[in-house]
Amino acid sequence: IVNSPFALSGLFAGLSSLVIFLYPSIIGVSVYRDFKSEMHTILYSYPFTKLEYLLAKFFSGIFIVHIIVFLIGIGIALGFNLPGTNPDLLTDFDIKPYFDAYIIYVLPNMLFTGAIVFGIVTFTRNISAGFIFVIVILILQGFLVSFGQEQENRLVAALLDPFGDMALDYYTRYWTVAEQNELYIPIKGVFIYNRLIWLTIGFAVFISIYKLFAFSQNAFTFSFRKKDSVRFTKSNFGGITKIDLPKINLSFSAKTKFN
């Protein structure tokens, strides 16, 4: 069944991995855009606090990504009900699997990953740094998927998987086809712990952003090359120009007191 709760969870899990590439250019760029357009000097003169500014920038980006994911979700739901679809591969429409997929995949992944990308691009003012992080976290997730194939590593991989795929696999790896077609996703135990771990990391990152961010800060830069030292030599020694001042005749006679 292609629209079973199990199939939909896998579909939205893959969607979360693809949408993450939008984060640097939507969520991360919200503060960077102010510096790039040199509008920050004007914006920072307004009477808002640092917290208000960061929350507005972060959640405005989250809202835009939410709209994109919401429209994709509507497209998926409508696609299963278009004329010509094979009824043998479909079950009756049920809103709960969509809601579960949003709660366990889309929202947590968006918040914690968005917070990290937001912080990286904000402090480096470099969108490329955000994309590098996206690639790194996808590599990490791929490593954990491979690591979790061994039975003794399943629990560790389930807890550390940033997208929650291995946490779902922890409970559903040995499901039969009938169970995959009929049962809802088990939101319990290890799955909840995984989501809480990464939401906590995202929250901690945002708190760090708030603590470190300053309206007058300079961008953080990273370089593995040692910069050549430059010697500055003062070259204007003896360059003082002599000026002939007009001569003044001083008079201390008594008649000056009557002028």
Residue ranges of predicted features:
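Secretory targeting signals
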Residues: 1-25, 55-127
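Terminal transmembrane helical anchor/hairpin motif
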Residues: 2-5, 85-93, 128-212, 216-220
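Hydrophobic alpha-helical transmembrane segments
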Residues: 1-34, 58, 62, 74, ...
